[in-house]
């Protein structure tokens, strides 16, 4: 594969506060279950690319649940959100949409929420001349090639800031 560049990466931390109680004596109505709120939010993250019109990926890759006991209603959850797109503005709009969804869920479930951006790297379009030359070279050598974007972060995104850059992906 020959990527035209690297997607932007936007990382966020989300923390929810609930109310820990014993499972048995606590009625379902009125619970402030931080894990249930997080579960709803995680589904929203998974649905986000379709809602935003595609050409984007998003995931929750990390979650901590406290006290993480089978007989205690969770009172704290921390999870991460990773949004990637070729369009930086679209990724920011996607996060704004999620923030509104998350806030509504937190209010409905009585679980105060804190959200924080932890890392952002803008998309990195590679040098058109170099990318074209890599594609031409593959053709000249009779090698298959695929013009694409890189969804993973690479050092090349930083090299791209100081010099013309291109990458070659080899199937593994």
Q: What is each stretch, according to the model?
A:
Residues 72, 90-94, 145-148:
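Extended hydrophobic-aromatic, low-complexity segments
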Residues 103, 132-148, 171-172:
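Catalytic-core signal marking the mid-to-C-terminal active-site face
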Residues 59-69, 79-86, 112-131, 157:
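A short beta-alpha structural unit
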Residues 6-8, 52-54, 72-75, 107-109, ...:
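A structural signal for short secondary-structure junctions
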Residues 25, 47-60, 105-117, 144-149:
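Flexible, glycine/charged-enriched surface loops at secondary-structure junctions
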Residues 94-103:
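Short amphipathic alpha-helices in soluble, non-transmembrane regions
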Residues 1-89:
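Midchain, well-structured core segments that form catalytic/ion-binding scaffolds
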Residues 145-172:
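Zn-dependent metallopeptidase/amidohydrolase metal-coordination segment
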């Amino acid at each position: 594969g020959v990527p035209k560049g690297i997607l932007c990466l936007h990382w966020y931390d989300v923390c929810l506060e609930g109310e820990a109680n014993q499972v048995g004596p606590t009625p379902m109505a009125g619970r402030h279950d931080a894990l249930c709120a997080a579960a709803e939010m995680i589904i929203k993250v998974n649905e986000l690319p379709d809602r935003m019109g595609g050409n984007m990926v998003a995931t929750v890759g990390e979650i901590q649940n406290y006290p993480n006991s089978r007989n205690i209603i969770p009172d704290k959850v921390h999870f991460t959100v990773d949004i990637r797109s070729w369009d930086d503005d679209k990724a920011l709009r996607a996060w704004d949409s999620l923030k509104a969804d998350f806030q509504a869920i937190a209010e409905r479930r009585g679980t105060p929420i804190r959200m924080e951006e932890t890392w952002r790297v803008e998309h990195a379009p590679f040098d058109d001349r170099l990318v074209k030359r890599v594609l031409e070279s593959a053709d000249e050598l009779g090698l298959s090639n695929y013009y694409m974007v890189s969804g993973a972060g690479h050092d090349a995104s930083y090299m791209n800031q100081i010099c013309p850059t291109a990458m070659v992906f080899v199937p593994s």
